[in-house]
Each structure stands twice: as C-alpha cells, then as structure tokens.
UniProtKB/Swiss-Prot annotation:
Undergoes ER-associated degradation (ERAD). Residues 45-72 are annotated as: Disordered. Its main location: endoplasmic reticulum. Residues 1-33 are annotated as: Necessary for its localzation to the endoplasmic reticulum and lipid droplets. This is UPF0729 protein C18orf32 homolog. InterPro entries: UPF0729_C18orf32-like. Belongs to the UPF0729 family. May activate the NF-kappa-B signaling pathway. The keyword Transferase does not apply. Signal peptide: none annotated. One of its GO terms (cellular component) is endoplasmic reticulum. It holds the Pfam family DUF4512. It comes from Rattus norvegicus. It is found in: Endoplasmic reticulum; Lipid droplet.
C-alpha cells in the first residue's frame, strides 16, 4: 500500500506546474531581483582534479568489471 503523501504531493505539484505556474511566474519574475542570476563567480570554472580519485565507487587502478559467476 502506498502512503497518501506519495500520491497527493505529485498530483499537487502537477496541478501547480500545469495550471498555477503560468499565472504566478510572470508576476514573480517582475518582482524577483535579477542580480542573483547575473552575478557569476568564475574562480573555479574549469578547474577539476580527479587524478587518483574514486568515481562512482570504482578505483582508477585494477579491474572494473564484475563477474556474475559463482566461485566454489
């Protein structure tokens, strides 16, 4: 059995997105300050150091394939 909020919340979000947001968004966009969108911090853009790091749980060294065969 599925809990009531698991059914009600997605339905309410769909109703908001489909019917209420087209009327609310134009009003909010006029009031909301655009400074937050225009200010970008470009200090760390493009700086990525992933050498020797685990990605998705796989280490960079050693085999990455998983065997499905049982070993006795």
């Amino acid at each position: 059995m599925v809990c009531i909020p698991c059914i009600v919340i997605p339905v309410l979000l769909w109703i908001f997105k489909k019917f209420l947001e087209p009327y609310i968004y134009p009003v909010v966009s006029r009031i909301w300050p655009r400074k937050a969108v225009q200010q970008l911090d470009n200090k760390n853009t493009g700086k990525v150091d992933c050498k020797g790091a685990d990605t998705n749980g796989f280490s960079t060294k050693g085999p990455t394939e998983v065997s499905d065969k049982k070993k006795d």
